[in-house]
Amino acid sequence: MESKIEILSTINVEHSDDLYKIVDTLNRTLKRDNLMFGLALDEENKNQAVFTIYRT
């Protein structure tokens, strides 16, 4: 069985510690709808975060 992850959207936002709480809540709430959310620090600008929405 092959698992394919599709990127639906990516956006750069100002980094905030609370962003991780939002991403965690979205992942817990929308997992059954085959959606996954990711958050990473921008490698070039540590004041920015990269927020990504995936379909699993």
Swiss-Prot record:
Stored Pfam families: DUF4264
Protein's name in the database: Uncharacterized protein YpmA
Gene: ypmA
